[in-house]
Amino acid sequence: MLFEQWAPCKDLALVYSDRDTWDSMLQQGVQLLERFTQDGRVKIRRPRSQQQIQFTRRLTAGNSFVGFVDAIGELDGTPCVLEWKTSSARYPSEPEGIVALDPQLICYSWMTGIEQVAQVVFIRKRLVEVQYLRATISDQQRQEFQTLVEDTVKRIEAGQFLPHSGIRFPQNPCSSCPFLGLCLDQRQLIDTALVRKPGVDLGLFDELAY
């Protein structure tokens, strides 16, 4: 199946990183699947119907939130929502509880009503690795996420598009954030990104201490 899906890409004009080729990525994919199978920690009893599952949640204003869950199955015998990930590095597992803060896992739990969630991370490196991260999402987290969703819908309908941070996970380089440079007081980045409107007195910010 992997070869069948990957074979049509061989003749495409794809741009690979310095260390990657079509053959090397195929080999890594095979090795990752072999490791995943050998671990034997994940079970999906009905793979044809329990993967890429569509869920629809009705919101209070009459709107619908539509999402797709990667899979519902078991990790180490515990029923849970499963999320597949690929990465070139391990995801952080400390401090304790950090996995439960992942917005996508909270979303999956809210969509399905299932409190147990897990990430299965296929790590592409010289010695391949599969990482298993589990978390329990609380009722409070699900309620807060629904409030966030409904508030976001209201802002979209009102045409309010507020800036938000652009931190990438797990490496977390600041690459696409509207506040780039401000949090670390990097003056060159601030001068490049900051727009000063005519007639606005910003002198008070010179008095702030960080």
Language-model features: where?
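Conserved aromatic-histidine-acidic binding/catalytic patches
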Residues: 17, 21, 93-97, 137
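A residue-level signal for conserved active-site and pocket-lining positions in enzyme catalytic cores
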Residues: 29, 71, 177
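Generic beta-strand structural signal
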Residues: 47-51, 67-69, 115
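Non-catalytic protein-protein interaction segments used by genome-maintenance enzymes to assemble
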Residues: 53-107
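Metal-dependent nuclease catalytic regions and adjoining charged, substrate-binding loops involved
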Residues: 98, 107-210
